[in-house]
């Protein structure tokens, strides 16, 4: 529904209908889970503070980060003049950094703690995302690759930290439903992030046309 906001009247009507339907289904499940003890996602999960905070943090963080794989290749091609293959290879270091960072997470968390890592890394991710705007067509490729590599590593640190703290305080009988709900939340957040990126892109396209 978010992706169609800002389009013509027919698409806007479809977007509003989709959002209204989704909201109604969510409210319906809330009413169901409130009266049934064997619900797939029991509301008691949300009484665990770390789980609740982790879900909200995951959602907000992925809203911005999930749009990067959509928008960054477009920037590299349209604004910087790279070919599609060049743009794809330029952002490959983000995935490489994410994989290389995973084995270091246990040591980092033991050394600095969840609170310090999440506070510092959240600011760092925001700065790295905003500073992409400082680059231009004349920026050296090695500098762009280094920037994207660091951003990929910081993204990995962010999500790994948030995922582990989300499940940290769940009781054994809550682990299955908690893991499942966290996975659903991640998919929703990524979908919202991509839709939000598309919405912003469409808004600026219309502004340029005007």
Where are each of the predicted segments found?
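Phenylalanine-glycine-rich, low-complexity intrinsically disordered regions
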Residues: 1-15, 31
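12-transmembrane solute porter fold
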Residues: 11, 38-210
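Structural signal for the C-terminal ends of transmembrane alpha-helices
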Residues: 30-34, 101
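Alpha-helical membrane-inserting segments
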Residues: 1-2, 28-29, 131, 200
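Hydrophobic core of alpha-helical transmembrane segments in multi-pass integral membrane proteins
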Residues: 16-31
């Amino acid at each position: 529904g978010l992706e169609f906001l800002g389009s013509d009247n027919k698409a806007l009507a479809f977007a509003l209908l989709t959002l209204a339907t989704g909201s109604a289904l969510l409210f319906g499940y809330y009413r169901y889970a409130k009266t049934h003890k064997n619900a797939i996602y029991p509301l008691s999960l949300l009484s665990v503070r770390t789980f609740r905070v982790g879900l909200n943090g995951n959602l907000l963080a992925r809203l911005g980060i999930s749009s990067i794989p959509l928008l960054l290749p477009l920037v590299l091609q349209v604004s910087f003049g790279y070919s599609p293959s060049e743009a794809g290879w330029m952002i490959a270091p983000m995935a490489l950094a994410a994989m290389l960072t995973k084995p270091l997470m246990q040591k980092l968390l033991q050394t600095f703690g969840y609170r310090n890592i999440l506070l510092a890394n959240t600011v760092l991710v925001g700065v790295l995302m905003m500073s992409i705007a400082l680059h231009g067509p004349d920026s050296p490729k090695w500098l762009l690759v280094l920037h994207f590599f660091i951003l990929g590593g910081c993204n990995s640190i962010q999500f790994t930290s948030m995922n582990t703290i989300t499940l940290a305080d769940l009781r054994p009988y809550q682990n299955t439903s908690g893991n499942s709900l966290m996975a659903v939340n991640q998919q929703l957040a990524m979908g919202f992030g991509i839709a939000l990126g598309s919405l912003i892109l469409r808004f600026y396209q219309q502004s340029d046309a005007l």
